[in-house]
Amino acid sequence: MEEQGMGIRVEAMSPEYAHQATAWAERLGLPLQDDAAGFAVQVGADGLQIQQLGPQAPGPVRVDFVDGQAAHRRQFGGGNGQMIAKAVGIAQGVRPQVLDATAGLGKDAFVLASLGCQMTLIERQPLIAALLEDGLTRARSDDEVGPIVGRMRLLTGNAIERMRNWEGEAPQVIYLDPMFPHRDKSALVKKEMRVFRPLVGDDLDAPALLEAALALASHRVVVKRPRKAPIIDGPKPSHSLEGKSSRYDIYPKKALKA
């Protein structure tokens, strides 16, 4: 048997999803057959998911804004008192327009949208963007979550280029959560990180990301970092909000007002 590699194939979970699988394969430029693939983009009743293949592989990764972790955080996450809410400047009468330039699976953007912020998301990795698009599409039909994801607009491509060539009104706040090269072991075992790492790699362009964000944002830039990680090379943040495992470095440009 061939060793599991870095290749990616698309597969239908059952015959009725073969047409959708073919459509995604064409769109993503991926094969429907690859016995040596290390990953599979699977299409089924629960939408789109990425499954790492092989005997030690963790479970699938998908975007679900309606049930599970997202639902729990929406109901019990602490509302406007959450650190991320304070970091982006949510306050009484203030719901900034936020650009999440490193969207990933959209968890932080969804939290901010659920608190009333108009969100624009950028995701550079086409597979992750596909998961996000699929999750947003499914969530739109939910009575409770539909209005929240209605505040989330997804863009794909290189966030640095997107920000440098921005058209229209600048976002008030830009939120960055770059991949960090040396997560501690407990975080590394999270299945999402195990799947993400080989597909996405580290964001070694974090200083350029910060520079582009500072040039574009009208009011502030917020950078999420592991708690003990160094600040990104470049201008120093004015202050930080620190939690148990992560912190938010805040780069203000002007005050957000109601």
Swiss-Prot record:
What EC number(s) has UniProt assigned to this enzyme? Answer: 2.1.1.242
Which domain of life does this protein belong to?
Answer: Bacteria
A single GO molecular function term of this UniProt record:
rRNA (guanine-N2-)-methyltransferase activity
- Bias class Basic and acidic residues marks the residues at 239-252
**Subcellular location as annotated:** Cytoplasm
UniProt-listed Gene3D superfamilies: Vaccinia Virus protein VP39
InterPro entries, per the entry? 16SrRNA_methylTrfase_J (IPR007536), SAM-dependent_MTases_sf (IPR029063)
Q: Where is this region: Disordered?
A: 232-258
What is the enzyme's class at the highest EC level? transferase
Recorded GO cellular component terms are:
cytoplasm
Q: What biological function has been recorded for the protein in this entry?
A: Specifically methylates the guanosine in position 1516 of 16S rRNA.
Q: What is this protein called?
A: Ribosomal RNA small subunit methyltransferase J
